Amino acid sequence: MAKPEEVSVPIFTSLEPVYGEGSLLQEATQRFDVLKANFNDVFGASPQLFARSPGRVNLIGEHIDYEGYSVLPMAIRQDTIIAIRKCEDQKQLRIANVNDKYTMCTYPADPDQEIDLKNHKWGHYFICAYKGFHEYAKSKGVNLGSPVGLDVLVDGIVPTGSGLSSSAAFVCSATIAIMAVFGHNFEKKELAQLTCECERHIGTQSGGMDQAISIMAKTGFAELIDFNPVRATDVKLPDGGSFVIAHSLAESQKAVTAAKNYNNRVVECRLASIILGVKLGMEPKEAISKVKTLSDVEGLCVSFAGDRGSSDPLLAVKEYLKEEPYTAEEIEKILEEKLPSIVNNDPTSLAVLNAATHFKLHQRAAHVYSEARRVHGFKDTVNSNLSDEEKLKKLGDLMNESHYSCSVLYECSCPELEELVQVCKENGALGARLTGAGWGGCAVALVKEFDVTQFIPAVKEKYYKKRVEKGVVKKEDMELYLFASKPSSGAAIFNL
């Protein structure tokens, strides 16, 4: 039997296999009907097919996927649906949205076009998918013929800037729609890698978790996502618990603030890993050429710890990376090389170096190694012989530890998230933490199932009420920003 990551994206002729029954199916049916009608209105023809990909909430394992470590997310029911058709007679990509906030974007049907990153447009995410798919097809020897036009209509209900991977849901559904309309269907693990590469076209050094869970998710299961190679292991969460997702209402624009936030941490981790390599015996030139992530030097760190009767890589961090921030000059002295050269003059990394005044290497490495351990602690707890009650308590503790590390060591929180996490904990959550890139977006709270009906009104009262009064959010939109979620299904293609 094929492994889950080795099967291709399922193709359905009805909505039930993905959206189930009852109110969720009703809502989905209405969305698809409206999407089809709008497509006809905008483009004067019917779509050939639809593709969908969900957002996700990361339960634990923040900012470690790009360091080569496993993460533990689940898909949520909110998704992006794309209707698409090929237009042989025109050489344009016309990308429209059901939401009037996003005006139609038009691009040439040219897979080699450059994306104008200085002029940030929502349609750029589709072009990431378009370029990435063509590059991948070419590398596989797939002949797509000369470029043709595409008409595209997007309906996304994953809140943007929320830490729930609206961008990955868009890029994944776009890639799958393009793939399907050209008559292909790759394995899920190939798509996970391909879509991760796609998002790098927009200047985000994505680690791959968001794309992997969006494509590989299964109803009823969280997934332990491993990398190199990408694979997913089902994780059945204990009975009696529910995850509540709450938006801080501070939007995180990952692609816009990347040089000072997200990509900055990627570079700091790279520098920390190279210095650890050198301190643990590698020649500077060898470390610079071979070491890319903290997982690359974990073996050396564990050997160092082993000589001291431990297996914890944090011992090496404490010994060899000072807690005070490093200057560029200090790092260059240790590594005997200029920083731009160390990062291979990569434009994304150079933008980070230009914006940075210092580098907190000790704190970033300490977060990554401790968070990687918490992910496996989470999975081991789920699979243990503890009672469901004891499991839930332990999972909550791990989530609380994770948030502290994200906030204090990785500094990817913000005042709104700190307040929201505190409100969750004070009103019955077993554990709560920021989820996603941070610097805004959402928190996820683990709550006993029978407490959810009291928990949600309490959080509304303590966190959202004053924001409704100030006009930050409308009362009728609250269900978009605060909701309980069970693990939902992954990517799909529909011929309806």
Curated annotation (Swiss-Prot):
> Is-annotated flag, keyword Cytoplasm?
no
pH dependence comment: Optimum pH is 7-8.
Query: Belongs to which family?
Result: Belongs to the GHMP kinase family. GalK subfamily.
Active site (UniProt): D210
Q: Where does ATP bind?
A: G161, G163, S165, S166, S252, Q253, K254
Q: Which domain of life is it from?
A: Eukaryota
Which cofactors does this gene product need?
Mg(2+); Mn(2+); Ca(2+)
Q: What is this protein called?
A: Galactokinase
Taxon lineage: Eukaryota, Viridiplantae, Streptophyta, Embryophyta, Tracheophyta
Q: In which tissues is it expressed?
A: Expressed in roots, stems, leaves, flowers and young siliques. Higher expression in the elongating middle stem region than in the lower or upper stem region.
What is the annotated role of this protein in its UniProt record?
Sugar-1-kinase with a very high substrate specificity for the alpha-anomeric configuration of D-galacose (D-Gal). Also efficiently converts 2-deoxy-D-Gal to 2-deoxy-D-al-1-phosphate.
Per the UniProt entry, what species is this protein from, by scientific name? Arabidopsis thaliana
Residues that, per the record, bind alpha-D-galactose: R56, E62, H63, D65, D210, Y262
Q: By its UniProt entry, which SUPFAM superfamilies does this protein fall under?
A: GHMP Kinase, C-terminal domain, Ribosomal protein S5 domain 2-like
Pfam families, from UniProt?
Answer: GalKase_gal_bdg, GHMP_kinases_C, GHMP_kinases_N
Q: What are the site positions for Transition state stabilizer?
A: R56
Q: Which reaction does it catalyse?
A: alpha-D-galactose + ATP = alpha-D-galactose 1-phosphate + ADP + H(+)
The record's EC number reads 2.7.1.6
Tell me a GO cellular component. cytosol
Q: In which pathway does it act?
A: Carbohydrate metabolism; galactose metabolism
How the cofactor is bound: the record states:
Magnesium. Can also use other divalent cations like manganese or calcium.
Keyword check for S-adenosyl-L-methionine, yes or no.
no
Uppermost EC category? transferase
User: An example of a Gene Ontology BP annotation on this entry?
Assistant: galactose metabolic process
Which Gene3D superfamilies does the entry mention?
1.20.1440.340, 3.30.230.10, 3.30.70.3170
Q: Which residues carry this modification: N-acetylalanine?
A: A2
